Amino acid sequence: MRADLCPLASLLPPDAADEPETAYYRQRLDDPSLLDRAFAVQVEGSAFLAVPVGGCRKGGYLSVSEVVTGLAARSLLRGRPGFPDVRLSWSPYPDCCHVVRWGARVPYEDDPIAEGRFYGYSEEALASFAKTYGHLT
């Protein structure tokens, strides 16, 4: 979808995202070079990173508060390399975010370490998480 036809969301270069968010991914991803192919998606007044799949990263997501904004973001990411099967998961609850997802389906095993591996986080980042929050690896 052309950006000028989608006023509710726009794609920007990855450096348009906030530095703390970029640093978050840079510190945790097993393959930080994925950030070179990421997009900053500007929605609802802020720019959030959409990190593509690749290597051990099997999927990604972007939370949005409005369905129409999620539909716009989905349209912008669809068909781009590293963003397969872009879809919108609607929240049934009015006080929760809707989620634009891409890649494989998240394995809901109630296991934050498995989920971290799914999102391509490094073993070092997962070990740090486990130590901090007491989860087993």
Model-predicted regions and their roles:
Residues 1-106, 114, 123-137:
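A conserved ligand/cofactor-binding region detector
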